[in-house]
């Protein structure tokens, strides 16, 4: 049928992991459920009476006024940490959006946020080339370029195969520091404005 479409879901917390999985089971169309292994040890409250979730809708997990920060999956926790530091140490109010679904993309929610903030940062674990961030940036530029007061910034992994060693893996993947630096750049601030720099504060907040 022409109405059949697939969904690609990426949970970021134990609670929405349950919500997304239940929604995937009930959905009549094909669904791919991506669960990052880095989330396996994560603990959190999972109420029995969680409300149903719309597979096509992203979630604004934190409201803000200065910068829109879009993320999903394991990177969402890092995005929230960076947003905390940006607000506390630099006075930058960051609106954080959890995509939850990377197919389809909830562009109306992103457009509404960018219209409010004028600045967009996209953070994901994958490399930037050919990634979800590039697609979101392209759609925002194509459809609502007039909303933007600066360039769209992306945060992603280095363009190299992911190594097996955890130490080298940390070197390849982006984290709180890179996200914070991008948020501050979008807001027109510098990471060296504080006493210890962005890296130290983001690491302490993690």
Model feature map: region roles:
Residues 13:
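Ferredoxin-type iron-sulfur electron-transfer modules in oxidoreductases and energy-metabolism complexes
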Residues 7-8, 120:
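Short, well-ordered beta-strand core segments
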Residues 37-206:
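Thiamine diphosphate
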């Amino acid at each position: 049928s022409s109405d059949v479409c697939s969904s690609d879901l990426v949970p970021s917390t134990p609670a929405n992991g349950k919500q997304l999985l239940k929604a995937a089971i009930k959905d009549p169309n094909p669904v791919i459920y991506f669960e990052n292994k880095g989330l396996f040890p994560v603990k959190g409250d999972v109420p029995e009476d969680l409300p149903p979730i719309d597979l096509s809708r992203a979630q604004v997990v934190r409201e803000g006024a200065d910068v829109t920060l879009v993320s999903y999956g394991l990177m969402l926790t890092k995005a929230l940490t960076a947003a905390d530091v940006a607000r506390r140490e630099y006075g930058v109010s960051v609106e954080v959006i959890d995509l939850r679904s990377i197919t389809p993309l909830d562009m109306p929610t992103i457009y509404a946020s960018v219209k409010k903030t004028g600045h967009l940062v996209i953070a994901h674990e994958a490399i930037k080339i050919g990634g979800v961030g590039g697609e979101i940036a392209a759609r925002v530029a194509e459809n609502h370029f007039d909303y933007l007061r600066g360039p769209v910034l992306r945060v992603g992994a280095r363009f190299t195969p992911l190594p097996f060693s955890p130490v080298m893996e940390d070197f390849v993947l982006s984290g709180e520091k890179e996200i914070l630096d991008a948020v501050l750049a979008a807001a027109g601030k510098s990471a060296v404005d504080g006493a210890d720099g962005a890296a130290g504060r983001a690491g302490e907040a993690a």
